[in-house]
């Protein structure tokens, strides 16, 4: 895996391997990021040390985050095995411009044995000029599905129907346009930047992220002294609002079936915890780092390579918000424990009116704490104005 450039990562399992000496942290507290850090090839125990750079010790010093460690260890172990299996797929060698990455609970380092595998394919070029032969993709898919089954992962969603290839150049050229939504480019891009974890071809994975970030920084050269990543922040807010609207739209078509209603309560519950965390951990971190100076693209790369909780842990440490962090972690671990079961069991759990009332009360409390941290890092700036207007 490719180690993140001195990333904002407090002890998380991954994104690279072989840990080298931690770069120095300047007195400003801003992360120092080498242009092209060395790439590793295996994770194992190093996975817990790598994606951290100078922030590793920070994590160890924060007992408020200790409750998250078991999930990170589980993800490290499972992803190590999956990466090893994927590296054995011979057909992938024939496609050097292809990388694979995980999103969802594995990308957030919070998966349980019941978590789905959300695997994405990203190709460096365009569909028109670089489309894989159908037989190539079929062989890769078959080997990937067989490997996931052999390792005991749950069946891929829809029997693998989402294992389509996304093409980087198509996504970048369609950013903000009609095809952005129609081709699912928007979702693929947001998940890559907010909660992804490389599975294969780490070097290309990092190149893809750099290319995506460059799209948001296209005006940087004209505003080097006062540039703000408003374009990126707007895209995140759009993603959050889209997920909220999609939930409401699906409710319009709900059949008169208590089980289906319970499943949608469960989706809403997860939206208010994991999706909220994914989006606003990045917003909070960007606002925080932008207070001191212009946020460089290399610093945004470090934020992308960090997990959602790694972003929040560093912000909390830097702003004296450890008590607030501890409250958020307690609520989030309760959420993780409550949903660590098959979907049918979780749906039955939340179908109980009293339990559901308590669950959504805690979700509201979690959202309130996240907003408090956002207000804290935005205080004295016009950051909230740009998020709202």
Question: Which sequence ranges carry the predicted segments?
Answer:
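Conserved aromatic-histidine-acidic binding/catalytic patches
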Residues: 67-70, 74, 112, 124-132, ...
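Intrinsically disordered, low-complexity segments enriched in charged and polar residues
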Residues: 6, 12-17, 22, 125-130, ...
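Active-site nucleotide-donor binding segment shared across nucleotidyl transfer reactions
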Residues: 83-132
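Conserved nucleotidyltransferase catalytic core and NTase-mimicking acidic/glycine-rich helix/loop elements
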Residues: 2-7, 26-56, 203-389
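Conserved catalytic core of two-metal-ion nucleotidyltransferases
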Residues: 73-93, 129-232
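Amphipathic alpha-helical scaffolding segments
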Residues: 117-127, 135-141, 293-303
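N-terminal regions immediately upstream of nucleotidyltransferase
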Residues: 1-96
